């Protein structure tokens, strides 16, 4: 069944299904009527020669320039030509499909003033698999993602390039092969297609979807390391975290203990320390803080997905045009900067647990670097180097982009969100985080093979999955294939899926 876009109910999960899995979309009937009513009001105002930003005026610094009737006809075309000014490699198809769905949902609110044909063409392109080729770099996150969205708007004129059936081709050819009519651009249509933070918001939504899975796997990896290090398990008692009251920590402690359930460590017969190091016993607080950051970001992103991110906006019921800055990406870029830092923070803690597994002074009886032949063999010594390299890069990328505004457009646009930079770097942070967590998983599995007690059911399951892809390190071998396989394993979510089948949902 198609996902209905009505301007009010687009979730991160629905957007992920549209962007990645080709779910069909349908424009809500009431939404289509709202679009028609808004357009009719706009055309009345055009006939009455009411001055409206971006309709019969220039844009940015030229907003005080009033266009003639003849200029209005061609203005949208030249606006899009001028704004299609990005650079670099094309954004992944899933990001662009997400942005298209987001823009349709903005129009569905009935305040953008474009012709219905524009919105319906975007719907048809999504459903038939025509995806604009969009340079990922060039947006400053206000007025929205102008440069990349302008490449989407080129398609409304049959210009630019698109991906169709796995091939990159001129948009006019793609539209013809898919049987999609080219609507052209009339007054307001171009600006109504580009003037919002839809690409950075779609990217952020997909990152949040993936980070939720990654954080759950961080809890599984943590549980494995805790067992391998023979941790005192009192710090993971959910009652401790309920007393403080942070929902993320409560959730995280519960997830960790689910993975450890059934372990010999819970019998009370094994000797453990009175208190372990912070990288062990404060794991629920740290991973939990990341969960709480993600929860805030998710609320912000879903508000943006269902909000009127546009300028100007039109209120048909009041016969009113309002100009403002609803394109400003800060409500998304600020929480997403925090999410990027949160992923890096959890990665740092993952590496610290791996360090304890490797270090014979800290590992409670494990061999140095988790190898049987210390001296002749170096075990997982260099795996830690790799994790450290990734984390340094994550730390650099965790500098907030939302505070990096550079004034532009003759200082008319003198504060911008830089939200696209946030979105791009968060993708890089998460990619590194898959590698860091994969290395902790590999080290924890190696360490558990040196222990002679029974771990928890969730930990046993994770260990079994890891051993499908990476063998026990008996003697030294090149480890880069193992690191790569572990990174891809974490990215796939297979460990999480199998563990949840055994212990129940970790969310």
Positions of predicted regions on the chain:
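Generic structural signal for well-ordered secondary structure
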Residues: 35, 52-55, 68, 72-73, ...
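Catalytic or ion-translocation cores adjacent to nucleophile or general acid/base/metal-coordination motifs
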Residues: 69-84, 356-368
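Short gly/ser-rich anion-binding loops that grip negatively charged ligand groups
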Residues: 65, 85-89, 108-112, 287, ...
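Short, well-structured alpha-helical patches and their helix-loop capping segments
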Residues: 107-114, 137-140, 144-145, 203-206, ...
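Polyanion/phosphate-binding surface patch
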Residues: 50, 65, 252
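Glycine-rich, flexible loop motifs
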Residues: 2-13, 19-49, 79-134, 226
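C-terminal auxiliary extensions adjacent to catalytic cores
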Residues: 2-23, 27-34, 38-46, 155-507
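FAD-binding core of FAD-dependent oxidoreductases
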Residues: 53-75, 83-105, 133-157, 173, ...
């Amino acid at each position: 069944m198609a996902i209905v876009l009505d301007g009010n109910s687009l979730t991160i999960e629905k957007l992920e299904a549209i962007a990645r899995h080709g779910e069909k979309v349908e424009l809500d009937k009431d939404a289509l009527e709202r679009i028609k009513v808004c357009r009719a009001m706009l055309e009345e105002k055009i006939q009455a020669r009411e001055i409206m930003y971006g309709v019969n005026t220039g844009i940015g610094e030229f907003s005080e320039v009033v266009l003639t009737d003849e200029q209005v006809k061609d203005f949208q075309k030249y606006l899009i030509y001028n704004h299609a000014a990005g650079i670099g490699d094309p954004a992944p198809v899933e990001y662009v499909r997400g942005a298209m769905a987001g823009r349709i949902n903005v129009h569905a609110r009935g305040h953008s003033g474009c012709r219905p044909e524009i919105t319906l063409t975007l719907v048809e392109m999504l459903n038939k698999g025509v995806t604009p080729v969009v340079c990922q770099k060039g947006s400053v996150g206000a007025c929205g993602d102008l440069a990349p969205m302008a490449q989407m708007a080129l398609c409304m004129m049959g210009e630019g390039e698109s991906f169709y059936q796995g091939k990159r081709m001129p948009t006019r050819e793609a539209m013809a092969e898919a049987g999609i009519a080219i609507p052209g651009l009339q007054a307001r249509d171009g600006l109504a297609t580009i003037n919002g933070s839809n690409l950075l918001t779609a990217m952020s939504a997909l990152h949040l979807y993936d980070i939720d899975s990654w954080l759950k796997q961080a809890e599984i990896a943590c549980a494995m390391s805790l067992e391998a290090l023979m941790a005192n398990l009192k710090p993971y008692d959910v009652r401790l975290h309920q007393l403080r009251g942070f929902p993320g920590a409560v959730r995280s402690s519960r997830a960790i203990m689910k993975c450890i359930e059934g372990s010999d460590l819970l019998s009370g017969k094994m000797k453990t320390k009175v208190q372990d190091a912070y990288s062990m016993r404060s794991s629920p607080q740290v991973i939990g803080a990341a969960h709480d950051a993600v929860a805030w970001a998710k609320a912000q992103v879903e508000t943006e997905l269902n909000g009127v991110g546009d300028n100007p906006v039109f209120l048909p019921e009041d016969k009113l045009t309002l100009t403002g800055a609803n394109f400003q990406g800060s409500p998304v870029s600020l929480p997403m900067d925090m999410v990027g830092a949160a992923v890096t923070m959890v990665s740092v803690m993952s590496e610290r647990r791996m360090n304890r597994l490797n270090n014979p002074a800290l590992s409670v009886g494990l061999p140095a670097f988790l190898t049987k032949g210390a001296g002749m063999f170096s075990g997982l010594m260099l795996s830690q180097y790799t994790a450290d390299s990734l984390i340094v890069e994550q730390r650099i990328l965790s500098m907030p982009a939302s505070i990096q505004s550079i004034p532009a457009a003759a200082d008319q646009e003198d504060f911008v969100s830089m939200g696209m930079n946030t979105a791009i770097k968060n993708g890089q942070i998460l990619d590194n985080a898959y590698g860091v967590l994969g290395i902790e998983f590999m080290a924890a599995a190696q360490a558990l093979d040196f222990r002679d007690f029974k771990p928890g059911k969730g930990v046993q399951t994770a260990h079994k999955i890891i051993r499908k892809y990476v063998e026990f390190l008996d003697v030294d071998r090149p480890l880069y294939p193992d690191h790569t396989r572990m990174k891809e394993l974490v990215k796939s979510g297979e460990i999480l899926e199998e563990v949840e089948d055994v212990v129940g949902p970790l969310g």
